[in-house]
């Protein structure tokens, strides 16, 4: 984002920002107050005043199911990324059906910034993965992404998530 009155060209953030944060941010720049929106304005972050309570992890979901990139949801921190590939169409259109066993990916972004090595089964990361799974469940609940209307997802979560 570049805003000559406040944000110099080339400004980069390391803070974790979500796409839902852009609407409240742009609204704040325009002097419009938005209430009851999912995202958070990151104007303060852009001004170099990141709030102390700014998120340390983000949750996202990729609904579209294709063989090249199966449907999944994930949690990311500044250092780690944990992804659950469930590969189901659910109610989505423009998706593909293909055989795929649900699986996990885990990356240490500090040691593997290009995500070349899936470290999900590396025992040294077991405590981090366990905590991130808990955090992911909490973030899913926080944004209302609980899959309650998809019994198939509940079965997959029982089989692959909680083990």
Region locations from a protein language model:
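WW-domain-binding short linear motifs
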Residues: 56-60, 154
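A structural signal for well-ordered alpha-helical segments within the folded catalytic domains
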Residues: 17-24, 40, 77, 101-104, ...
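Long, internal low-complexity/basic segments
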Residues: 22, 101, 119-163
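Substrate-binding rim/cap in mid-to-C-terminal beta-strand-loop elements of soluble/periplasmic
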Residues: 1-36, 40-52, 78
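C-terminal, low-complexity/hydrophilic appendages and adjacent surface loops
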Residues: 62-121, 156-163
């Amino acid at each position: 984002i570049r805003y000559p009155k406040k944000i110099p060209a080339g400004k980069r953030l390391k803070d974790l920002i979500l796409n839902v944060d852009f609407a409240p941010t742009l609204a704040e720049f325009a002097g419009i107050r938005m209430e009851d929106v999912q995202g958070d304005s990151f104007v303060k972050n852009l001004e170099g005043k990141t709030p102390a309570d700014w998120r340390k992890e983000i949750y996202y979901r990729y609904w579209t199911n294709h063989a090249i990139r199966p449907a999944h949801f994930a949690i990311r921190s500044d250092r780690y990324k944990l992804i659950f590939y469930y590969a189901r169409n659910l109610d989505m259109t423009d998706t593909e059906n293909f055989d795929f066993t649900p699986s996990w990916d885990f990356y240490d972004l500090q040691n593997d910034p290009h995500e070349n090595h899936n470290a999900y089964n590396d025992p040294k990361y077991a405590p981090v993965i366990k905590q991130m799974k808990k955090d992911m469940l909490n973030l899913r609940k926080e944004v209302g992404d609980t899959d309650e209307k998809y019994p198939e997802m509940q079965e997959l979560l029982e089989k692959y998530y909680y083990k």
